[in-house]
Amino acid sequence: MARYTGPRTRIARKFGEAIFGADKVLSKKNYPPGQHGNSRKRKTSEYGIQLREKQKAKYTYGVLEKQFRNLFEKASRSKGITGEVLLQLLEGRLDNVVYRLGIAPTRAAARQLVSHRHITVDGSVVNIPSYSVKPGQVIGVREKSKSMEVIADALSGFNHSQYPWIEWDQSSMSGKLLHLPERADIPENIKEQLIVELYSK
């Protein structure tokens, strides 16, 4: 399955929430897309509800099925609550950390910055969006990329204090992952236990 590159509002409407960030169209059309989207009311099965939650998590973090399955298996082997560990692993992806640091306006934009070699980890360029950032590592903007408009616009007025597990130094345009976030600190509206139940079938 290839990564979805179509209209993001259509996917957000499918889930009834702005999983990609603020969406003006979604606020006006908060119902499923399609000709009968505003009138369709079908009872969803338990499996359907669980599958929907997994799809929402995949779209939110921009992760493909195989990657998502691998992360779940890693989470299930780890100490701690599997669903919470899964979200921590998703949060620890380099593209997500770049997004949380405010370097990019969306996770998709963050993924592109990483792929195009604009981001460093501990001073070295890393171009793998799925790279797992470890606590204590420093994520920075490559020197020649610091003047990029997309980065400057994203950082302008960004509130870094909203994420207590990271810190940001504007002078060096770099940030540090202090620790993996607690579940209560992750703002995404994902019911991770439903995903655990789906994979446990």
From Swiss-Prot:
GO cellular component: small ribosomal subunit
Entry keyword set: Ribonucleoprotein, Ribosomal protein, RNA-binding, rRNA-binding
Pfam families per UniProt: Ribosomal_S4, S4
Swiss-Prot/TrEMBL GO biological process terms: ribosomal small subunit biogenesis; translation
Residues in S4 RNA-binding domain copies: 92-152
Keyword Membrane: no
Molecular functions (GO terms): rRNA binding; structural constituent of ribosome
Region (Disordered), start-end ranges: 27-47
Keyword Ribosomal protein part of the UniProt annotation: yes
InterPro entries to which the protein is assigned, alphabetical: Ribosomal_uS4, Ribosomal_uS4_bac-type, Ribosomal_uS4_CS, Ribosomal_uS4_N, S4_RNA-bd, S4_RNA-bd_sf
Subunit-structure text: Part of the 30S ribosomal subunit. Contacts protein S5. The interaction surface between S4 and S5 is involved in control of translational fidelity.
Family: Belongs to the universal ribosomal protein uS4 family.
Known function: One of the primary rRNA binding proteins, it binds directly to 16S rRNA where it nucleates assembly of the body of the 30S subunit.
PANTHER family per the UniProt record, alphabetical: 30S 40S RIBOSOMAL PROTEIN, SMALL RIBOSOMAL SUBUNIT PROTEIN US4M
This protein's name: Small ribosomal subunit protein uS4
Gene: rpsD
